[in-house]
Amino acid sequence: MTIEHYNLGERYNPRACERKWQAIWDEKKTFQTVQEDRREKYYVLEMFPYPSGRIHMGHVRNYAMGDVVARYKRAKGFNVLHPMGWDAFGMPAENAAMQNKVHPKTWTYQNIAVMRGQLKQLGLSVDWSREFATCDVDYYHRQQMLFLDFYQKGLVARKVAKVNWDPVDQTVLANEQVVDGRGWRSGALVEQRELTQWFFKISDFSEDLLAGLEELEQWPEKVRIMQKNWIGKSQGLLIRWALKSTEEADEVCKSFDEVVCYSTRPDTLFGASFLALSVDHPLAQALAQKDKALEFFIENCRSGGTTTAELETAEKQGFRTSLVAVHPFDVAVHIPVYIANFVLMDYGTGAVFGCPAHDQRDFDFARKYDLPVQPVVLPSGVEREDFAITETPYLGDGVMINSSFLDGLTPQQAFEEAAKRLEGQMLNGKPQAEKTVQFRLRDWGISRQRYWGCPIPMIHCTSCGVVPVPRADLPVVLPDDVTFEQPGNPLVCHETWKSVACPVCGQFAKRETDTMDTFVDSSWYYARFTAPFAQEPVDKKATTEWLPVQQYIGGIEHAILHLLYARFFTRAMKSMGYVTVDEPFKGLFTQGMVVHETYRDEKDWVSPEEISIVEKDGKRQAYKLTDQSEVTIGSIEKMSKSKKNVVDPDDIIASYGADTVRWFILSDSPPERDVIWTESGVEGAHRFVQRVWRCVALSAPVLRDVVPCVGKQGAALQLSKVAHRTLYAVEDDLEKFAFNRAIARLYEFLNIMAPLLNRIENVEDEMKAALRQAMDFFLAMIAPIMPHLAEECHAALGEKTLISELAWPVCDRALTVEECYTLPVQINGKKRGEVTVAATASEAMIEEAVLALDFVKVHLVKKPVKKMIIVPKRIVNVVL
């Protein structure tokens, strides 16, 4: 293909140029990864999108970041894999089917077509030949193969679990979909039901998943902490408490003569004032059978919030039973047993003892039910008679008090001493306690009572039980002839689809009608991208070459579930020989959101397109375009349709071009922080685009025939030094994801070049050669961020190659060495002036130069120097 540049005499037209270069890249297959390429491999991946209908600015920022990394690494000589796909199963497609009378498949693939076109408009350097959607039969066929592999490996379990059941929608709801006890969509009161569900045994990997976090040095510390807390390893004791009843002939107490509590703080046992059991504890269930009031209390608790966060923030409620627990260190002390709404059955044993003086939850409960609050930990340095628990519990360290044989010990020492004593005591012929390790992480329930998901390849036979679909009979394909006129899962009603012969005995059987959680789909897609057409789920040779993903990019909202499940999947696949790594993602970057001002009139939210903003008396005021009525300018918030502060990327690209959008969205804020979208910011970015083009258009007739070269002396040498220093700094910025810093340097660089380019015909030949090299550097540096403009300028300078295929320029380190630098000088912490020193100056030389400064000498007349604090290349502080 002949590469032609745009007419130099015209204003840069991004729409025409961007379409042209995208067509050239497609025709030349510039970004199609060649597996056999022996160069060092680099895999960059952004979390793939859900095809909701249209991309938003959050997508643009996410994929622009990944594209900068991909283009930069490609220029640095790596064989880059940068794929794209679609996380396509899920509830929104079923909602659309019900609301719009359209099949989920039709809705999904229509959205994919639209969003693919939008992403291509951005000029992403994606290998589209590897594209797939998780709803493609080819993809979920391989996912079913993985399920069977997991099943054979013992990593799949089928067991009864308590779920949130929406009686109107007739489906299970995730905890997050229960709002104030009601279904998020139907508004129906949610019921707690026990259903038989399919689980992946992620808990088998708890210790390994926790230990692996230490190796993820290129992950944000915040994400690692969140996963560590979610896995929730704790070391404690299982303590057996003898039970007694306050009522004679208590049949329940005869059946339950003891209860086991898990505690990480046995050192606080002498401060215990109650035992609390989960509403789902077997003892609570037994007591409720004979107590209607307790039965009502339990049902009321179950209708409230179900998430851990909701239980922690909800008002603490308890029901006092007829039972008391005998204190393990003092049989004369009996403490009441409650059924409480804040105790979780799926953590520990579903029973805890409460020490109100040293735990906020226990303190709140004790205050509500007028229970004793006995302090047993005294803060260090505080007299015992001066210490009391009044308004809040004491949560810190110290020494033990009011604790018999533990007095005077630290809590850590008391833990060991209490454990030793309890392990030596006997209750009903067994030690009263044993040390144990517990994890918060529970097995992953993957069953969903929905149609639009990957079918679980299992068959229910009345004779053989539950048996797997033979691998040769896969895939189990979703039927197309379903309707959504009634709530619930249409697969349950599809007799033709679910009726099947048992693969073991041949008798009549039924298919499993649950489908897999959509998090399963995204737990292994990164491995599939390495060989998307392999017959097996993944190709071991390909995964060995490409995994782990060197750089993964996405929102921090996926810090726990998606990222944890992907880590589990990689370990599981390694155990089956599919991959050779433990971790899927070597580097992780979590970008901030795109936010925008909100606008509101007396009735509703108003979109940015409906208003104009003017300055009045130094203040910004907003007015409706239709009737000039005043609009309130609200807070800056995440873009959302509900608040109408969404900006459509298509509109901005149509007005300014993709490069302007990419440049602005990466320039205005550090990438880990939120970026505030402003029209003025976009206009500023577009002015820069036009300025770059003007500089090239003016200088191209001269520079296209100039051989680039480093300046040898004078102004030409100084320009070359600036060019090489900028190249060196921008390279470092891109390695560190500091895109905004790189862009700031490029603004400065153009400011230095522009005056020289504007009078290019009048400069010396040496300067022309230095300018040509500087411009080549500049275009190479903007190319990852504004690829279309860089290509157009590169062609305008007479080049017949694609800048997207060029190597990154080589920096001459000798030209980057600063000969001198300037330091701010403080006297007693207040800046008084500056000092310029040689780049090689020692601290002694810096001190000598500072003492020779006139403004320093003036202060030395009154006071001598006590010390001088020198932070090299940062600051000097003279302390008098």
Curated annotation (Swiss-Prot):
UniProt cross-references to SUPFAM superfamilies, sorted A to Z: Anticodon-binding domain of a subclass of class I aminoacyl-tRNA synthetases, Nucleotidylyl transferase, ValRS/IleRS/LeuRS editing domain
The record's annotation in CDD domains points to: Anticodon_Ia_Leu_BEm, LeuRS_core
| EC class (word) | ligase
Chain sites annotated for binding ATP: K641
- List the EC numbers from the record: 6.1.1.4
Tell me yes or no: is Glycosyltransferase among this UniProt entry's keywords: no
Gene Ontology MF annotations: aminoacyl-tRNA deacylase activity; ATP binding; leucine-tRNA ligase activity
The UniProt family comment states: Belongs to the class-I aminoacyl-tRNA synthetase family.
| Motif 'KMSKS' region: positions | 638-642
Q: Which reaction does it catalyse?
A: tRNA(Leu) + L-leucine + ATP = L-leucyl-tRNA(Leu) + AMP + diphosphate
Query: One GO BP annotation here?
Result: leucyl-tRNA aminoacylation
Q: Motif 'HIGH' region: which residue numbers?
A: 49-59
Q: What domain of life does the UniProt record list for this protein's source? A: Bacteria
Name its cellular compartments: Cytoplasm
* Protein name per Swiss-Prot or TrEMBL: Leucine--tRNA ligase
- One GO cellular component, as annotated: cytosol
| PROSITE patterns noted in UniProt | AA_TRNA_LIGASE_I
Family annotation (Pfam families): Anticodon_1, tRNA-synt_1, tRNA-synt_1_2, tRNA-synt_1g
Tell me which UniProt keywords the record has, alphabetically.
Answer: Aminoacyl-tRNA synthetase, ATP-binding, Cytoplasm, Ligase, Nucleotide-binding, Protein biosynthesis
- Family matches, as InterPro entries: aa-tRNA-synth_I_CS, aa-tRNA-synth_Ia, Leu-tRNA-ligase, Leu_tRNA-synth_edit, M/V/L/I-tRNA-synth_anticd-bd, Methionyl/Leucyl_tRNA_Synth, Rossmann-like_a/b/a_fold, tRNAsynth_Ia_anticodon-bd
